[in-house]
Amino acid sequence: MKTLIAAYSGVLRGERRAEAARSENKNKGSALSREGSGRWGTGSSILSALQDIFSVTWLNRSKVEKQLQVISVLQWVLSFLVLGVACSVILMYTFCTDCWLIAVLYFTWLAFDWNTPKKGGRRSQWVRNWAVWRYFRDYFPIQLVKTHNLLTTRNYIFGYHPHGIMGLGAFCNFSTEATEVSKKFPGIRPYLATLAGNFRMPVLREYLMSGGICPVNRDTIDYLLSKNGSGNAIIIVVGGAAESLSSMPGKNAVTLKNRKGFVKLALRHGADLVPTYSFGENEVYKQVIFEEGSWGRWVQKKFQKYIGFAPCIFHGRGLFSSDTWGLVPYSKPITTVVGEPITVPKLEHPTQKDIDLYHAMYMEALVKLFDNHKTKFGLPETEVLEVN
């Protein structure tokens, strides 16, 4: 603004000097020299003003981009936490209003469509390609690293580690096209598996299905691996709620030793196992960790047992400032590395020995994947993956 005022003042001074020269009509050479000097000074000031305007515009654009990134992340966090409950309350309320017909129509549709999530849902490439997901990706940023090709003639079960608080890397990489998963693995259809209870929530279920998210239960996985052709990739966050309870910055630990159900499913369908590790997933939120035996951990375990998820006391940054607490995750890089597939035979009735063998192979492959890539993403060579 100061530069613009200076430029405008320069224009006025130049015009006054020129007018004085014409009226006095004395030294023509001197007058022409002064007029030329005024014009060059004015041009220089205007150019400087324009440069300042462009630089301010660029800075403002940068700030707008950052705020759009924050908003895009916050909308997903709020959807994850409250959309289902909020929509349930709103629909129940409409029964008591003149809009009761809307609720009746929706619940009629819900009854008709109840089993759709179990058959892979209704993915929408339009939703998966929304621009909001690119802002979501750039906020952290999030990237997907491919180490090996996947055959479209095979089906796969990806074990995703660690869970983190919300599994933000899993969502961005496999339920949107922000990191171009379909281009990196052409012909492969990713299905991120999450709690079946989410699909009993009105509106939220439609939102989840549009991204290719499905319930993490046996019926759904059996259907996708046996009746949906080949080229399917089921992404299972193996550690689940138990792993989220120990999520904290600086910690690389997975809950895996006693998680063998996904291996049994892979054997029954002959689906290859793919170890997947997300570096930085635990860095984006801080939470209160309750020690084993404490009342807080007791409450969390009861929730986990009867409801399927464990409530966490966590925080990120505020909406307008990174110096305040809020629900927006911290802007920390998340890099998801997809490892080499482990070829699994199809055994209709796998024995415990078979399950233990391929589970051990999977654990070994996951640790190897972690060790091969840890130094590339800021971890020291001495960092060890803790397998619980």
From Swiss-Prot:
Phenotype of null mutants: Mice are lipopenic and die soon after birth, apparently from profound reductions in substrates for energy metabolism and from impaired permeability barrier function in the skin.
Localization per record: Endoplasmic reticulum membrane; Lipid droplet; Cytoplasm, Perinuclear region
GO biological process, one term: regulation of cholesterol metabolic process
Pfam family, one: DAGAT
EC main group: transferase
Keywords recorded for this protein, A-Z: Acyltransferase, Cytoplasm, Endoplasmic reticulum, Glycerol metabolism, Lipid biosynthesis, Lipid droplet, Lipid metabolism, Membrane, Transferase, Transmembrane, Transmembrane helix
Entry comment describing in which tissues the protein is expressed: Predominantly expressed in liver. Also expressed in testis.
Positions of transmembrane segments: 70-88, 93-112
Reactions listed under catalytic activity: an acyl-CoA + a 1,2-diacyl-sn-glycerol = a triacyl-sn-glycerol + CoA; all-trans-retinol + an acyl-CoA = an all-trans-retinyl ester + CoA; 1,2-di-(9Z-octadecenoyl)-sn-glycerol + hexadecanoyl-CoA = 1,2-di-(9Z)-octadecenoyl-3-hexadecanoyl-sn-glycerol + CoA; 1,2-di-(9Z-octadecenoyl)-sn-glycerol + (9Z)-octadecenoyl-CoA = 1,2,3-tri-(9Z-octadecenoyl)-glycerol + CoA
Induction per the UniProt record: In white adipose tissue, it is regulated by leptin. By insulin. Up-regulated in diabetic mice. Down-regulated upon fasting and replenished upon refeeding in adipose tissue and liver. Down-regulation in obese animals can reduce hepatic lipogenesis and hepatic steatosis as well as attenuate hyperlipidemia, thereby leading to an improvement in metabolic syndrome.
Domain of life: Eukaryota
EC number: 2.3.1.20, 2.3.1.76
Topology class, membrane: Multi-pass membrane protein
InterPro entries noted in UniProt: DAGAT
Protein family (similarity comment): Belongs to the diacylglycerol acyltransferase family.
UniProt-recorded name of the protein: Diacylglycerol O-acyltransferase 2
Biological source species: Mus musculus (Mouse)
Upper taxonomic lineage: Eukaryota, Metazoa, Chordata, Craniata, Vertebrata
